[in-house]
Amino acid sequence: MRKVIGIGETILDIIFRGDQPSAAVPGGSVFNGIVSLGRMGINVGFISETGNDRVGNIILQFMRENNIPTDHVNVFPDGKSPVSLAFLNEQSDAEYIFYKDYPKQRLDVLFPKLEEDDIVMVGSYYALNPVLREKVLELLDQAREKKAIIYYDPNFRSSHKNEAMKLAPTIIENLEYADIVRGSLEDFLYMYNMQDIDKIYKDKIKFYCPQFICTAGGQKVALRTNLVNKDYPVEPLQAVSTIGAGDNFNGGLIYGSVSYTHLRAHETV
């Protein structure tokens, strides 16, 4: 059975409405997509790390409840599990503050065994962080060797926009590994100060990875490949919260792909 393996951060999101906390739920960009897939009965795995504390226990229990094995989560004895504060505005968009205290030794964990046509999800700053780069590359190399499909979501946030130039070589390396790239217009604004989808694809993506999907919140979804140039309208809706919207888009897209037993990246588009 095909597997979907993610690597990324697990964090406890404390959600505020009107300056009052309303909920506390485990989150993380790749993690959110894996949770959606686990709930849908897909065979998933997640590579991550958390502290040996109450927050870490909440995260691990949440994973078990959502059909995600915890075998590949490094529970570190030093440091603390990360926490974020998510402040929702009137449009239910979130502004984040992060609190992190990681140990020096990171991601000391065995990776799951990959097979051909498995899907590997990578993204966010976790896939760019120099401290974790060696481990991320180890997974990407294994995926390439086993002919797994690599799905890359840059999920590049405003907190890192001043590092965009410094991180550019690592972003390019991730694009070179990727079989499918899915990003939002917001990501590319912070990465490249660009908002034109066709220009982003032509100048920044296509040379490295021909399969590109770009979302724009409540606006259209754009698909660009060597053979396809299509835009898909998005039905209007009243969002309860936009937290994890792009992450769950990833989950839905991958769920559709996994429904086809022998679907390679170039066949999906």
Region annotations inferred by a language model:
Residues 262-265, 269:
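Single conserved hydrophobic/aromatic residue that forms the stacking wall/gate
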Residues 26, 235-253:
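Short glycine/threonine-rich catalytic loop with a Thr-x-Gly-x-Asp
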Residues 149-150:
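Short beta-strand/loop segments at the ligand-binding rim of alpha/beta enzyme cores
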Residues 43-124:
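Conserved N-terminal subdomain of the carbohydrate kinase-like
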Residues 37, 184, 246:
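Short, conserved phosphate/pyrophosphate- and ester-handling motifs at nucleotide-, phospho-/glycolipid
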Residues 146, 160-231:
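Conserved phosphate/ATP/ADP-binding segment of small-molecule kinases
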Residues 1-69, 240:
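Glycine-rich phosphate/adenosyl-contacting loop at the front of the ribokinase-like
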Residues 10, 125, 154, 248:
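Active-site metal-binding loops of divalent metal-dependent hydrolases
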